Amino acid sequence: MKELPKIYEPQQVEGRIYQMWMDHDCFKATPDPDKKPFSIVMPPPNVTGQLHMGHAMDATLQDILTRFKRMQGYDVMFLTGTDEHGQKIEDKAKAAGVTPQQFVDNIVCGEKGILDLWKLMNISNDRFIRTTDDYHVEAIQKIFRKMHDNGDIYKGTYKGKYCKPCESFWTESQLVDGKCPDCGREVEDAEEEAYFFKLSKYADRVQHLLEDTDFLQPASRVNEMVNNFIKPGLEDLCVSRTSFTWGVPVDFDPGHVVYVWVDALFNYCTALGFMNEKYDDYDKFWPADVHFVGKEIVRFHSIIWPAMLMSMDMPLPKHVYGHGWLLLDGGKMSKSKGNVVDPYALSEMFGVDALRFFLLRTFPFGSDGNFSNELLINRINMDLANDLGNLLSRTVAMCEKYFGGTVHNVAGTEAIDTELETMVNEL
């Protein structure tokens, strides 16, 4: 029997083995026709810069659930994409001396861009949408017009505070020490003609949704949304901008572009064919079974998103789960702050499989987790090198000693096989 190497070099092994699995359709399962389709839609990252380890963790956790559901026999739609409009992208492009479209193209499709990162981390998404895609832009214009025609969007003047990094509007009373309550950064004064969505109209229905159903999880997120946003009084939401141009144009009022969060949220439906002819599986995969979202965007997905769907008379997603942050030195990883960990460097050093295992094994999903190289190394040594490595070493040694280094075909199953299969099916 060939002697195992003393040191594991992931670059020499993982890509070759993973490609072999792909070539043999090892990750494809035959859907059970008796099971309803299952859909998981990932919040599209805003493409203001290269993604970091926090994004890789977000995608990996959702990919793992997707693969598990496929193994259970579900016909799964795993949707990912990118949020490519907004003022901060326009500003970043200007500073880089390129057009906004060139800027986002490079972040998405360029070397070590988002598509490369998804490939690196073995993300098995079924579809990828860019909010600059023509079919999505046209669908958003139709959606905006319909909410306007329904009487839920009206023109006025916005005057208040705006956090450019978060693309969020705030009132003076919502600020924390005069700064954005989500990211803690400076806000700027904003005053411009704008369209507003009647968010206040749906306050009671949204509160009932949060308090009386299991729509939003965990329960701590429900208390936060109700006590911090709904009970103080929901104000109507500014849903268009006139101070910049990089966005979906409001087709019936030149000069206005659709607020980036309206644009981004509806990608979950347009990517399935809603209000467009690009795809035709909206009825099959909507409503989504689950949204996994970072806690900083729970407000958008549990208050604003349901209200707009109610306005459109569309089904609501079944569940929204607000997960914690991946922290570095006690603070949230942020592209704009520059406190990020490069997933490319980590994967080259430790391997993608070990990295995916570490992310799933180490951090409680609903809570924040503080990343460090020491924690990653200890987890790999303890669980993989020591526990799994020792098990493999002893198994190979016994196989060599007692069976001449060969594994013979086993006829039939034993009770322990049936018991194990039952346990897996009950997960």
PLM feature spans:
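Cys/His-rich short segments
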Residues: 150-207
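Short, charge-patterned binding micro-sites
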Residues: 82-88
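A glycine-rich phosphate-binding loop feature that marks nucleotide/adenosyl-phosphate handling sites
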Residues: 85, 160-166, 324-326, 375, ...
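Bulky hydrophobic/aromatic "packing anchor" residues in well-ordered structure
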Residues: 83, 111-114, 206
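Structured secondary-structure scaffolds
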Residues: 1-80, 135-139, 183, 189-401, ...
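A broadly conserved sequence feature marking short terminus-proximal activation segments
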Residues: 103-162
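Acidic, turn-prone loop/beta-hairpin segments
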Residues: 83, 403-427
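A charged helix-plus-loop insertion that forms the helical arch/lid used to bind
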Residues: 92-108
